[in-house]
Amino acid sequence: MTEKTIRLTTAQALVKFLNQQYIEVDGEMAPFVDGIFTLFGHGNVVGIGQALEEAPGHLKVYQGKNEQGMAHAAIAYAKQKNRQRIYACSTSAGPGSANLITAAGTALANNLPVLFLPADTFATRQPDPVLQQLEHESSTAITTNDGFQAVSRYFDRVQRPEQLMSALIRAFEVMTNPASAGPATICIAQDTEGEAFDYPVEFFQKRIHYLNRQIPTKRELTEAARLIKASKTPVIIVGGGARYSRAREELIALSEQTNIPLVETHAGKSTLEFDFKNNLGGTGILGTLAANKAIRDADLVIGIGTRYTDFTTSSKTAFDPTTKFININVSRMQTYKLDAFQVVGDAKATLAELAPLLKGYQTQFGNKIAAYKTEWLDERARLQTTKFNRETFTPEIKDQFDQAILNEYADRLQTEFTQTEALITINDNVAPDSIVVCSAGSLPGDLQRLWNPAVPDTYHLEYGYSCMGYEINGALGAKMAAAKKQEVYAIVGDGSFCMSHSELLTSLQYGKKINIMLFDNSGFGCINNLQMANGSDSFFCEFRDSDNQIMQVDYAKIAEGYGAKVYRANTKEDLISALEDAKTQSKTTLIEMKVLPKTMSEGYLNWWNVGVSEVSNKESIKQAYEEKQANLKNARLY
């Protein structure tokens, strides 16, 4: 190291360092940090704000409208870029920083890299307690930002300018490591942001972070091949790791070579297009009938880049007790799940090495894969044409709302539109390369089952944290990451819209057109289904006023007030017309659809373990508890 230095404030050094971070994947190099979202307040406006104003470099700066909302946009950007490009997020101290914590949980649960820069209290403590500072009798060192420790892959505090160097180097190692990718949080004391230091110039050299494709050992590959050859009906679960590895070609080649069917997690969906003959779609609690039948048949499950969440495993009841597992993952920790044979490696590289070892091998599925897929497509076609009537209508979610209640909803919402018909209509009428973004409620289930991606990397579901309010804000991030003319559709329920839609305004502010598909069934329909399916009555999940009337909300008018182009569509014909006109618009659009409750799709061959009350005065809850205990007898314990 030379003795040459450059005098900068801590914040200026931060911005200069971010400009010098690059990532190289398969010989292609690009900047790793494309920009920064910020909401200025005391704690960052005169520190990081000054540094960005004076010398932003190539960093694009976006003004967020809510800290959680802008952070979800940053998370979606990283997800859509397959974890190879990021945005940072800077906030003020106190509540501004606290608003990031939920989003940090979203990033951590989904293994997505984001750099969080929450401002902190004074390092000198001279003016304490400052505005928005918490006071604890037990410790002066505790601040709001301690809440980040549970939701960060890497957490650090900078209270002296020279601490920035080691903090940033460690943070970027974590964010650019496929095995540990996740949010890095660096809390910078607000007085330290403006404090100057003579930094060594070498700290600001161009740094290239290489995403090397880890190849498993010969032992791992040989044993994995032996286990596959010994199986008769293996199934591959395509997880998010397969998508981030860009393993599409290798998955197709191996499946064609061996006739192994493919099923998908939310994170893995659209790694390859649905039209591939052996792709049976989503698996688990929200899976297709075809995928869940294949998993039920499996004597070997090959999990590629999956965390095996309860929604993938149906709370560990989806598999036969004798089923064996091979787990291929860059994270050694993930490979240990379900007592699997562990293969630590990159999905794309591992599949390329494995294929030659399986030469001549064929599963015994035969024509069963095609039969399962045909049966499922027939079921999807039925769901596309469900029609309401006022006398004998049976919704997909049966035995919860009677005809009178459904008629009440039809009258109050002035609609007979079913949710499944509306969703499939959207799928059939948007451009094939359109990106669909969703996160929470009943819509992820419909998307996992019914949305058929025609182009890879166009299905964008945040289902690690399933955070309400991600949809619209995440759509902005996906749009920022998308090709110039690629349309992005936020699929959102009225519940999630109410939770957060702050970056709708940001999309209009910066000309980043998104299309918001708002499904209004006047309530938290997904959770209403859950409570009633487990013996409870409908209780505080419907949007009813103090007179027990179903609420009537004009969500389109809210978006219109922001400046969006809006439509109201309560029939298939009106929806198609709105979709076509929305394609011609240059600014953000919102299509409001009033849909009937209980008309979302129901599960197939699945079960979800939830905390049903063991003691109750209601017979229906007692029965639900007994059913839970019976299902647990078929579940793996770990």
From Swiss-Prot:
Coiled coil, from the record: none
GO cellular component: acetolactate synthase complex
Keyword Magnesium tagged: yes
Region annotation Thiamine pyrophosphate binding: where it falls in the sequence: 442-523
Pathway terms, separated by semicolons: Polyol metabolism; myo-inositol degradation into acetyl-CoA; acetyl-CoA from myo-inositol: step 3/7
Cofactor(s) listed in the protein's UniProt record: Mg(2+); thiamine diphosphate
SUPFAM superfamilies, A to Z: DHS-like NAD/FAD-binding domain (SSF52467), Thiamin diphosphate-binding fold (THDP-binding) (SSF52518)
InterPro entries in the cross-refs: DHS-like_NAD/FAD-binding_dom, Myo_inos_IolD, THcHDO_hydrolase_firmi, THDP-binding, Thiamin_PyroP_enz_cen_dom, Thiamin_PyroP_enz_TPP-bd_dom, TPP_enz, TPP_enzyme_TPP-bd
Keyword annotations of the record: Hydrolase, Magnesium, Metal-binding, NAD, Thiamine pyrophosphate
Functional summary from the UniProt entry: Involved in the cleavage of the C1-C2 bond of 3D-(3,5/4)-trihydroxycyclohexane-1,2-dione (THcHDO) to yield 5-deoxy-glucuronate (5DG).
NCBIfam families assigned to the protein according to its UniProt record, in alphabetical order: myo_inos_iolD
The protein's name in its UniProt record: 3D-(3,5/4)-trihydroxycyclohexane-1,2-dione hydrolase
Organism in which the protein naturally occurs: Listeria monocytogenes serotype 4b (strain F2365)
Lineage: Bacteria, Bacillati, Bacillota, Bacilli, Bacillales
